[in-house]
Regions:
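Predominantly soluble domains enriched in secretory-pathway, periplasmic, or organellar proteins
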Residues: 26-444
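Gram-negative bacterial Sec-dependent N-terminal signal peptides
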Residues: 3-23
């Protein structure tokens, strides 16, 4: 009963926020215009209340749960099952290739699902039908890692500010596609020769800077992240971390990138203006090193201790998955974000034996969705639910999750699959902290 009250309260707050205007990175954080007052006696058309839905693209990595399609849950009603959107596969093809990423576009009213099978599929959110499918190259590409398709498509996609263009990673090769969100037409490519295995991505809210991550590092003489001037499609510099780069997050202006790397329970921080790694942040060794030294004693999804990192929108906390202890570990993030402080009192245990290998958050930073299927109250640091399918089965390897708001079948707000810093949320937090200090000082 307590969980239900918590969820309903969260949903009510979200509805109130939506009624005052939707906020999305795709419209630069601007609030949508309030409807003009109608003349007296005017009969207004019916407008449905906003709906808050969670879209989960399956199957994920190590998809032993046999899921297929995009599972939709109702965030306004205890995350109950709403629908499963199929990929149009024959029975003999199910569950289909692993899903490598998902993003959405407000103006196009579409979601986009990338697959290891060599395609990116666009779904019309008004009909839930396939609108178009993008295939990569016409001939075999150089690298076909982990069974990725010979056409070089596709890894994680990212919707650029404005919602009209998609930035899409090739499947572990050294270029990124620019795709028209409405039509699926290829608009161009960004070449990143020193980061040879494209994988994860984050973009600043103004669309000026992109951090393009590659599963690569010094062991193969390669960098891990390309810092790109997005309007000019130009690589500004490359960043090399201590090992191969895996999931990443960025602060509000992209001046800092935080990266999971192989062989580390924790993360590393780099300054994107200098291209230098500035700090290695590690969980206390006694908590993980013995388990990592004996992988037969513990299962590590993706083959590393930490595959999952996110930042609250206000940048007050950095969340990192800890596969060695079946938990999310949290670092407080004071000041300029260069010196996080581990806070064991905030640790969030998750389902044992099912590694939680990703994190996404709602735009308001109140709710997190993590890889083992857990739904977490971010402020309380507590699991409040589990993502489940139509049969009540927990969804595992939930690494491609979007929290979206609809009105009359039209997408009006969306999160993205990465949990990154937000300038307005950070500014509001800093103002609040300043006001609190001033009030405290005046009281003394």
């Amino acid at each position: 009963m307590q969980t239900r009250k918590t969820l309903m309260a969260t949903a009510s707050l979200a509805i109130m926020a939506c009624l005052t205007g939707s906020v999305s990175a795709q419209n630069g954080g601007a609030r949508s215009a309030s409807p003009a007052a109608a003349p007296a006696g005017t009969i207004l058309p019916y407008q449905s209340p906003p709906r808050h839905l969670i879209y989960i693209a399956t199957p994920g990595d190590e998809g032993a749960d046999g899921q297929s399609g995009v599972v939709v849950l109702d965030a306004d009603h205890d995350y109950r099952f709403v629908k499963r959107i199929p990929y149009g596969l024959a029975a003999s093809e199910l569950p289909g290739p692993k899903i490598s990423g998902m993003t959405s576009s407000i103006p196009a009213n579409k979601i986009y699902v990338t697959t290891d099978g060599g395609s990116m599929i666009a779904f019309d959110l008004k009909t839930d039908k396939i609108a178009w499918t993008f295939k990569g190259e016409t001939g075999p590409v150089k690298l076909q890692r982990r069974g990725a398709a010979a056409d070089g498509c596709c890894e994680r996609p990212y919707t650029l500010p404005g919602g009209k263009t998609l930035l899409v990673a090739s499947a572990y090769n050294n270029w990124w596609y620019l795709i028209d969100a409405q039509t699926g037409a290829k608009l161009g490519r960004i070449e990143t020769p020193e980061t040879p295995h494209t994988h994860n991505v984050a973009v600043t809210a103004d669309g000026k800077l992109a951090l393009l991550a590659s599963i690569s590092g010094p062991k193969e003489g390669a960098a891990g992240v390309a810092v790109v001037d997005l309007p000019n499609k130009k690589v500004l510099r490359y960043i090399t971390f201590s090992d191969d780069v895996r999931p990443i997050t960025i602060n509000h202006d992209g001046s800092l990138v935080y990266a999971n790397v192989n062989n580390l329970d924790g993360f590393e921080i780099a300054d994107t203006k200098t291209g230098k790694m500035i700090k290695r942040v590690e969980l206390p060794g006694e908590m993980w090193k013995a388990k990592w030294a004996d992988p037969n004693a513990h299962h590590f999804v993706h083959g590393l201790p930490s595959h999952g990192i996110g930042m609250t929108p206000d940048e007050s906390e950095i969340w990192v998955t800890d596969a060695a202890n079946d938990a999310w570990q949290i670092w407080d993030n004071p000041g300029d974000g260069r010196n996080p402080v581990y806070n064991p009192s905030k640790t969030v245990p998750i389902r044992p034996g099912i590694n939680s290998s990703w994190i996404s958050m709602t735009n308001d930073g109140k709710t997190a969705f993590v890889g083992d299927g857990s739904i977490i109250d971010v402020r309380a640091h507590r699991v409040i639910g589990i993502m489940k399918d139509e049969y009540g089965r927990p969804i595992q390897a939930a690494e491609k999750v979007l929290a979206m708001t609809f009105r009359d079948g039209k997408l009006v707000e969306t999160s993205n699959q990465f949990a990154i810093g937000d300038a307005k949320a950070r500014e509001a937090r800093l103002e609040h902290e300043t006001g609190t200090r001033q009030a405290s000082n005046s009281g003394n």
